[in-house]
Curated annotation (Swiss-Prot):
GO terms for molecular function: DNA binding. The gene is sfsA. HAMAP family: SfsA. It comes from the Bacteria. It comes from Prochlorococcus marinus (strain MIT 9303). This is Sugar fermentation stimulation protein homolog. CDD domains: SfsA-like_bacterial. Belongs to the SfsA family. InterPro entries: SfsA, SfsA_C, SfsA_N.
Amino acid sequence: MTEAIPKGSLGSPLLTFPPLEEGVLVKRYKRFLADVELVSGEIVTAHCANTGPMTGVLHPGGRVRLRHAPSPKRKLAWTWEQAEAPSSQGGLCWVGINTALANSLIRAAIEAGHLKQVLGPIAAIRPEVTYGSNRRSRIDLLLTPDANCSDTRPIYLEVKNTTWNEHSLALFPDTVTERGQKHLKELIGVLPESRAVLVPCLSRHDVQTFAPGDSADPRYGELFRLALTAGVEVIPCCFGFHRDKITWEGLRPTKTTQS
C-alpha cells in the first residue's frame, strides 16, 4: 500500500512503500506474465500490468523490481513494478512499468500541490467518471476547481504512462493505440465548456521533453496536434523510481512532433 507524502522540492518523496524485491528478468510472455529470478535464486511468475511492447525497457537478463502481495483474491503473488533500462544520460535508469500506478501518481502530485501553477487550486478529485459522446468512456480524473479560481470550468484529465525514451525525449505511444486515439477525440469533445488536459506520466527521471510517438503511431501524432490546436492542454509530469519510493522530478515541456 502506498502512502502520500506532503509536498516538497524536486526529488522529494511523493509515494513510499515497503522495499521492492529485486531480481533478473528471465522472460515476458502472454503480455501479462513475466518470469523473474530473485536474488535468492528462486524463479517466480509476476503479473505485468503493461500491455505495450515497453520499447527500450524490456531487456531479458536486466534487473527488475517486484512487489510481493499474496492474497486469496490474486492469482499471482508478485507484481512487476520497475525495470532497469539504459539511460540517455549514461548508465542505467529505473523505469516504472506498472501502468495501473500512473493515475495514483498524478493524483498524489495534484494533492501535493505540484500542479497548482498550471491547474489552479483544486477543490475535489473524482476518478473514473463516465463521459464522452456515447457515455462509454471513463476519464481518469475529473477535477473541480476551487470556487475562487479564475477558471471554474471542470477539468477532464487523461493520464498516459510513458516509458519510451529516445535521446532524453519521452515518447507516447510506443505502439499503435486506437484506445489512445479515441481518448484524444473525447478530450477535444469536452471543449470549450470544460478544460481538457492530457498528462503524460513520465515514469523515468532521465527525460527532458515529451512528444507524441509519431514513428509508432502516426495517426496518434496527427490527433495529438489537432488536440493542441483545439485547446487541449498537455502537462508532462516526471517521476523518479526507487526501491522504496517514487519522487517528484518536476514538469517537462512538450514538443509537437517526434522529429
